[in-house]
């Protein structure tokens, strides 16, 4: 099945976000973890903390910065997903936080990446 342009942009944004975080000392644990309540884009570790990462990617700022797409409702859902992830992975002890990564990747241009730690 072919990806839509939006799906391809989202996948490339997740790839770039993962690489960006790895270059800053994060380690990738899992991609696209799914459960009945939704999906976590990236699960990583950073300094002994498990980090669930939501990645938002846009081709431009016409509809606002991608970080603006994380509404209160989305943040609440991410917190629920964090709890469910912990239940599914009892072997992973220690702190958990939620980071959000905004990627702006204009057609034919250079992408920019912004990370908000402990966003939710």
UniProtKB/Swiss-Prot annotation:
GO terms for molecular function: nucleic acid binding. It comes from the Bacteria. Pfam families: UPF0102. InterPro entries: Restrct_endonuc-II-like, tRNA_endonuc-like_dom_sf, UPF0102_YraN-like. NCBIfam families: PRK12497.1-3 (NF009150), PRK12497.3-3 (NF009154). HAMAP family: UPF0102. Belongs to the UPF0102 family. This is UPF0102 protein CMS0765. It comes from Clavibacter sepedonicus (Clavibacter michiganensis subsp. sepedonicus).
